[in-house]
Amino acid sequence: MPALGFLTRQRLRRCFRALPLLLSLWSAVAAAQGDAARVRGTIRAQSGRPLADARVAIIGGDSTVTDGQGSFVLRVATGRALALRVTRAGHVPDSLVLPPLLAGGEHRLALTLTPLAQLAVQQVVAPPSRPLLNASDAATGGVVEGVELRALPTEGRDPIALGFTIPGVAQARGFFGDAPRLSINGGNSLYTQYTIDGMDNNEGFLGGPRVEFPLAALARLEVLANSYSAEFGRSPSGVVNYETRTGGERWTGELFAYNRPGIPFDARSPIVPGGERPADFRRAQDGFRRTQLGGGWGGPLRRGTTYGFGALEYSNENQDRISSTARATFLGRELRETWKVAGRIDHGWSPDQTTTLRFAMSHASRAGEGSGIVAPEADITTIRAGSISGVTHRSAWRGGRSSNVAALQLATYRWDFPPTRSSFNTPQVTILDRDSIPIGIVGSSNFIFDEQELQWQFRDVMEHHLGRAHTLRAGFDVALSSFQLTGSSTNPSGSYEVVNTGNIPSVNGRYRFADIPSDVFVRSYTIDAAQKQVDLTQGLYGVFVEDRWRPTSALTIRAGLRWDYDDLTSRGESSADLDNLQPRLSINWLALPGTVVRGGVGRFAGKLPYAVYSDAVQFGPDGNQTVTFRGAQAPRFGQGPRAVDLDRSALPPREIRELFALGIEQPMSSQLTLGVQQQLGARASASVDLVWVDTRHLPRSWDLNAQGRRIAAGDSVGVPVAVGDASRPVTPVTGGYRRLTTTESGGRSTYAGMYTALRYDLTETLVLDANWVWSHAISNTEDINFNATQGNDFDAERADANNDRRHKVTARATWRTLRGLTMSGIVDYQTGMPLNRVAFFRDLTGSGGTYGDGFIGNYQRFFGVPRNGERLPSALLANASVAYDLRVGGSTVTVRGEAFNVFNRLNYSGFPTGLGGGGSATQVGRPGDPITYTTAAPPRQVQFSVAWRY
C-alpha cells in the first residue's frame, strides 16, 4: 500500500503513545468550557424596537452581534466581575458591569440604547415601524399603522373611525351636528386635541379636527391617552396625531374609485325617526349614493436629497330627505361634496440638516335642496373648510448628541351656514293653514353663523444628550388665533308666520316666496334685535422641560415640567390663570428581555374652547336678542322692523351672559397609570394598564340670578315663568334679564379604567390588535353650555358621564394571503351608554327657556329621578373587507368589497352622534317607563372600490 508508506511502525508507535495526552487535553478543554458561564439578552432601541447588528462585547474578551430579534448569547469567564459594552451605529454606546458568575450559570439581561439624532433625509422619510414592546415611556393609547389604515374597512375613507379601535378611545356623543366624533377616557370630545406631525390641527371655536385629512396621505394614526410626555399639552384628556406619508426611494402611486350604491345592497333601517311616516322614510333611503375618487403619488424629486408625496381625494354623495307633517310630505335632497388635499416635501441640506414643507386642506359642503315643507329656496348649506401650511427644520450637531426641531405653521378655518339659493335680503316665511299647521317654509334661511379663524403657530424643541444617562429636552409653543364671527338668531330681514286663506297658490304642494301676496294675514313676526359681529383673539402659550434619565440600561425615568397659559382666562372679570404648572413623572423598566413594567403620574392642562368667550359677547348685554310681535302688534307683510329700529329697553326679559363674572380657569386633570407589557414569542405581546384620571375646572354655565324654587315630590305639571320669577334674587322686568349666566370652572369628572391589550404581528401576513377596556366615568357637567336643572345644584347632576361605557371590547385584524387575497375586519362590542329621563320637557319650576338645553337634552326631571340613571342596550358592530390583487404588467389592480355592520344588528348606542337633545339617550317619564328609540346606528352598508397601484 504505497499510499500509506509514510506510516512506519515507529511512527504508529509514537502516535499511540501521544493519544492519552491528546485525550486528556481534550477533556480539560471540554471541562473548561463546561465550567464557563453565559450571558443571554435582548438589545432594544429606546422605543422598544429590537436592534439587529448591535455589537455586544466583554471588554478584553469575546464579542458577538445581535440577530434580527435583537437577541445575543455570549460565553464569559467565571469567578470575576466583567465589563460589558454595547455599541450600534446611530445610538449612544452603553456599558455595564456584570456580577461574578458561577460555572455553568446564566445571566439574563435586557438593555435599551438611546438613539442619536439622525437627520439625513433618508432617515426622515423612512420612520421605523411600531415595536411590540414600548421601552421608552409609560404612555397609554395606541397606533394604527399604515398597512392597517389601507387594508381595514373604513366607511367614507375616514381615518377617525379607525381610532375607535385603540384602548381608551370610543365613539363620542356630541351635542351639535358637526361635533367631534372621538372621545378619550369618557370625556367630552371637544377637549381631545388633534395634531398633524405634532403641529396644531384643531378647529378653535369649539373643537375637533380643522382639516379632514385624506387617508391616502396618512402614514400612521396615533392616540396618546395617558401619562404622555411633557412635550404634549393643551388637553386634559388626550391627543390624536396624524403622521403624514413621505416619498420613498422609488416612485409609487395609486388611483382609486369607491362607490356606495345604497339600496338594494344596503339594508333598510328599521328605525323611523320621530315625526316621519314609515313609507316616506323608506322611500328616502332609496335616494342615497356616494362616489369617491382620488389618488396619491410619492417618490424622489432628487434622489438622495429631496422627496415628495401628495394626495387628493374627492367625495360626492346625495341623500334624499323626507320630513312629514300632518298635511304635507315632500321629497328633498342634500348634496354633499368634500375635497381633501395633502402634500409634503422633504429636503436634506446635509446629513445634519433637513427641511420639511407641509400643506393640507379640506373643504366640506352640505347643500340642502329642500326637505319636507322646507322649499329649496329656504334651505341652507353647511360649509366647513380648513387648511394648514407649514415648514419644519431639523438640525443636529455633536455627532447627533444635540438636535433642534423648529416649526412654523399658518392655519385657516371657516364654518358657515349660508342660504343655498337665496340671500338674506329675503325674509323667511312659514306658511300656516287655517288650523295653524305649518304647510310650507319659503324665502330664505333663518339664522346667520359665519365664523372664520386665522392662526399662527411657532414651536421649537431642543434635545441634548448629557453623558450616557441623561437626555434633556426643552421647548416652547405659541399659537395665536384671530376669530371673526357674524351671528344672528334670525334672518336679518326677519321671519314671518302667515296664514294661507286660499290666496297663496302652490304647485304640486310646493310654495314659493314670490307667490305670497302683500296683503296676506301675518300671524307673527320675529327679529333678532341685535345682530352681532364678534371679532376677538385667543393666545396659547406653552413651555416644557424634560429629563430622560437612564440610571441603568434597562430603566428609563422621564421627569418633566410643563406650563400652559390660555389668555382667555384674563378676559372679562377673570384674572389670568398663570399657575398651570404640570409636573409629570414616568418610569419604564425592562425587567426581563420580554417584560416591561411601566407607570406614570402627572398633571395635564387643557385649553378653553373659544366659544365660551365668543358666546359671552354675542349673547351679552349688547348681544343677540330675539323678539316676536304677535296679533295686533304684528306688522304688515314685508314691513317688519329691522334690528336698528327696535328699542331694546322695551323688550321682554331674556337670558343675558356675563363675561367670566366668577373667573375662569383652564381644565386640569391629574392622571395615574400603572401597567405591565409582556412579549409572547417573537411576534406577539400583551399588556395590562390601570388608569385613573381626575379632571377639574371644566367649564359650565352658572346662573347669577338663579331661582330658589325646587322640584317637590308632587310636581308633575309645568308652571308659568311668573312662579319661578318670584324666587329669583332680581325680579325680571321689561328690558332686563331673567337668567344672568356666566361660564365658570366648577365642573369635575373622574375616570377609572383597566386597559387589556393583545397584539400579534406577522409583518406582511397577519396583524391583529385586540383590547378590552373596563372603565367608569362620572361627571357633574357635560359641556360648556351644561346647566343644572334646579338653580345651580350641580351636585344633583353628578352621575355617569354621557360617554361612559363599562365594557368595550375591540379587535381589528388584517390577513394577507400569498395569492393576493387580503381579508380584514373590525369587531366592536360595548355596553350601553347612559340614558337620561326628563319630565316630558315640562318646566316644573317656572325657570323659563334655558340656552343649552336644546343641545344637551338635560331638561328637568321628576322628583327623585337621577340624571343618566338608566342604560341603552349594548351594541355590537362588525365590519369586514375582502380585497384581491391582480398583477397587470408592473402594476397592481385591487378589487375590493367592504361591508359595515355585517350582521345588520340594530344598535341604539355605541355610534358617534351629534344630535342636539341626545336622540334616544333622552327619554321621558320615570325609570322603568317604556323607551322610545328615535335614533340608531346605520344598518348594514356596502362599499365597492377598485384601485390601481404602481
Where are these regions (language model features)?
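Periplasmic N-terminal accessory/gating domains of Gram-negative outer-membrane beta-barrel systems
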Residues: 67-71, 90-110, 121-246, 276-282, ...
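Solvent-exposed loop/turn elements at secondary-structure boundaries
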Residues: 577-579, 587-742, 857-860, 873
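C-terminal beta-signal and adjacent terminal beta-strands/loops
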Residues: 683, 696, 701, 818-858, ...
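Transmembrane beta-barrel wall of Gram-negative outer-membrane proteins
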Residues: 252, 284-366, 381-410, 583
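A short, solvent-exposed beta-strand micro-motif common in secreted/extracellular proteins
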Residues: 80-90
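Gram-negative outer-membrane beta-barrel transporters
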Residues: 552, 683, 687-837
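Short amphipathic beta-strand segments in non-cytosolic proteins
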Residues: 44-47, 54-65, 89, 123-132
